[in-house]
């Protein structure tokens, strides 16, 4: 849909499949002032013109398309995009307008896809973790986009690393903090993102997975793999600067494993606006944006396995024991023991606990004739999980049973069983009955 304006603004080349081959490629136009030349090692590739390049054939590169607006044969440029939205800049957390961040939308959650996502998560407070899938780069990204790791509570940072490391191990994707290693400019931050909003607003662990790296698949790993140290990643910088040998390696990969697909040889074409041009170059949508079909299942299987594994870490209430002790004269002492069987605590994250974003456990009792001791409804606290333990028992002070709660009542039995409920927004709901007789 049109954005930021409903009507086209400005003139220039608008992307379009002008030669009818079903692809959006590049057009190269011979021009003595052009910034590009054919690579001497493989003339299919275009490389930047050097200072000393005074003679030879040079080109201008334009996206494949048609001219929009009034055509001037002396001035060529790409037209402003008609669809310039970026939904991952439209979430409410630290949202900034178009004048500060392009693609952000007219106001926070203005776009229906984002708004429905926000409303769904706000109405489903049981969500403990959230993953959004994008393409491309072959990385697992985590908060924050706007602040360094020191801004995260230590326990949450430890859990982000623990969860992310497992995904990184299974997929081969590096685990990155966006602020440290996935910024487009060292002087600016990405804002209005899904994962920052989920973590900050809901206190849920959140991830953005950029599926697929054709560069790594082609064996180009320097600055792009799990062994790369912080500050040395090239996921964004590669498109601004890389040795031509790496592009030749990528081209060889296409020749050897994709039957040449991924790169289209330059073909002469009589353009209706520009006259004679050549159309060809990298097929970005096929090669970079998405895994080619032959690689798709192998790329997605470990990601699916990781997401299922993440869900297994969520808090989960279980009834450990219930005890009915007769006291005589129709009185009973009733005791209920409930555990958190999950790896995460019932509150999920320190962010949620500090922000009071998750209610404590609620316990309800009904069906008795008279309540002698205890409360019909109780608002209790949270239960810890396994993640609160250190990785090694060295210097460990011992394990408290902080994963467990015990509730007791003294009641006079009624005509039927005494029912109990235990409820928690994130850890689930339990129901049962004490077997007592009047």
Listing of model-derived features with the role each one plays in the protein:
Residues 1-101, 195-199:
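Surface-exposed loop and adjacent secondary-structure segments within mature catalytic domains
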Residues 12, 77, 121, 199, ...:
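Generic marker of residues within folded, mature protein domains
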Residues 10-15, 82-84, 128-130, 203-208, ...:
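Extracellular structured ligand-interaction cores
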Residues 26, 30, 141-143, 219, ...:
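Hydrophobic alpha-helical membrane-insertion segments
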Residues 333-335, 339-438:
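C-terminal beta-sandwich/jelly-roll accessory domains of carbohydrate-active enzymes
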């Amino acid at each position: 849909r049109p954005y930021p304006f409903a009507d086209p603004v400005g003139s220039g080349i608008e992307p379009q499949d002008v030669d009818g081959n079903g692809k959006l490629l590049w057009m190269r136009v011979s021009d003595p002032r052009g910034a590009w030349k054919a690579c001497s090692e493989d003339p299919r590739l275009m490389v930047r013109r050097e200072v000393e390049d005074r003679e030879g054939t040079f080109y201008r590169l334009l996206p494949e398309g048609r001219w929009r607006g009034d055509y001037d044969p002396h001035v060529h440029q790409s037209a402003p995009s008609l669809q310039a939205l970026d939904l991952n800049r439209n979430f409410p957390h630290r949202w900034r307008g178009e004048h500060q961040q392009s693609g952000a939308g007219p106001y926070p959650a203005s776009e229906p896809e984002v708004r429905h996502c926000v409303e769904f998560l706000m109405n489903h407070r049981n969500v403990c973790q959230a993953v959004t899938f994008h393409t491309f780069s072959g990385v697992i990204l985590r908060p924050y986009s706007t602040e360094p790791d020191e801004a995260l509570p230590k326990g949450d940072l430890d859990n982000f690393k623990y969860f992310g490391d497992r995904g990184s191990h299974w997929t081969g994707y590096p685990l990155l903090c966006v602020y440290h290693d996935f910024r487009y400019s060292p002087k600016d931050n990405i804002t209005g993102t899904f994962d920052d909003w989920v973590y900050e607003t809901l206190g849920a662990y959140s991830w953005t997975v950029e599926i697929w790296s054709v560069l790594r698949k082609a064996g180009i790993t320097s600055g792009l793999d799990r062994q790369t140290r912080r500050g040395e990643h090239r996921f964004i910088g590669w498109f601004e600067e890389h040795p031509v040998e790496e592009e030749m390696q990528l081209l060889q990969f296409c020749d050897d494993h994709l039957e040449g697909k991924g790169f289209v040889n330059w073909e002469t074409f009589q353009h209706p606006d520009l006259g004679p041009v050549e159309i060809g170059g990298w097929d970005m949508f096929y090669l970079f944006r998405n895994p080619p079909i032959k690689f798709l299942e192998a790329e997605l299987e470990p990601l699916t396995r990781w997401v299922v594994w993440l869900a297994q870490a969520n808090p989960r209430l279980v009834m450990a024991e219930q005890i009915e002790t007769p006291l005589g004269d129709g009185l009973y002492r009733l005791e209920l023991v409930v555990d958190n069987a999950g790896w995460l605590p019932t509150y999920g994250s320190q962010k949620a606990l500090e922000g009071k974003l998750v209610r404590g456990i609620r316990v309800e009792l009904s069906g008795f004739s008279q309540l002698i001791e205890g409360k019909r409804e109780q608002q209790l606290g949270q239960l810890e999980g396994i993640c609160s333990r250190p990785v090694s028992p060295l210097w460990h002070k011992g394990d408290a049973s902080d994963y467990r709660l015990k509730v007791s009542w003294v009641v006079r039995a009624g005509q039927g069983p005494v029912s109990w409920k235990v409820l928690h927004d994130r850890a689930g709901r339990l129901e049962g009955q004490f077997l007592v007789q009047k």
